[in-house]
Amino acid sequence: CCMAGFAQSAEPCDEFVARLPNVKKPLCEAAKLQPTAGRSVNGRTLWVRDINPGNATVRVLVVGAIHGDELSSASMALQWIRMAEQPADMPHVVHWRFIPALNPDGLLNKPPKRVNANGVDLNRNFPTPNWERDAKIYWEKRTRKDPRRFPGPKPLSEPESRFLIEEMQRFKPQLIVSIHAPYGVLDFDGPAKEGFVPPSKLGRLYLDQVGIFPGSLGNYGGVHKGVPVVTIELPKSTRTPLDAEMRQMWLDLLRWMSERLRSEG
């Protein structure tokens, strides 16, 4: 149904470099993105990168560009792949899995758009409890049927959200880091474990828990599935923070993981 007129790129770097801020071809190629069986609505490959040193004690899933017009989120995921390849001074051995662009159709659209090719906000399409009731009411009453926030006809109606759920089931992360823009804050959804403290800041971004939305990844992962979800809202959609700032955010994340995440082997 969906492939007409669309030429699938054999490797993503030409398209990513042309579209993403602060991403040159050597950086993208060094990320060594691997194709998956996952496809977008328009048939684009969903790419991942695994960094697994072996004998990992913690698994962390990093997701960028759930919203296709938040270009900086995919850029920072690619920058962080480079950092994840360096040995880290921390007690955990981490298996990282990066999905830099969950919504490539929105990202590579001209102009880029928040929703996927079906017009669905992927971050409202995850199967949170009472989705059928709450997501529709929230969209109609709170957003006044904003088309940029349409949750879809049913939970997991979209191939991209189904792919992410399947990745979560396969990978079983102990932490999910979801990168967005442009609110310039840090959000956290997590299990109500006593003593579990979210990160207070990453770089210049400070914790400001913005609430729970029906169908969001934070609600699904953090509240429903009990997997902590750190949501990074970069300050700008079309520009990344400075390289030193992205590195500081990375180091702050590692420090928090060292203090708060429990190894499960």
Can you annotate each of these PLM segments?
Residues 33-34, 48, 98, 176, ...:
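Conserved beta-strand scaffold positions in the cores of enzyme catalytic domains, especially
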Residues 57-67:
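Short beta-strand element of the alpha/beta-hydrolase
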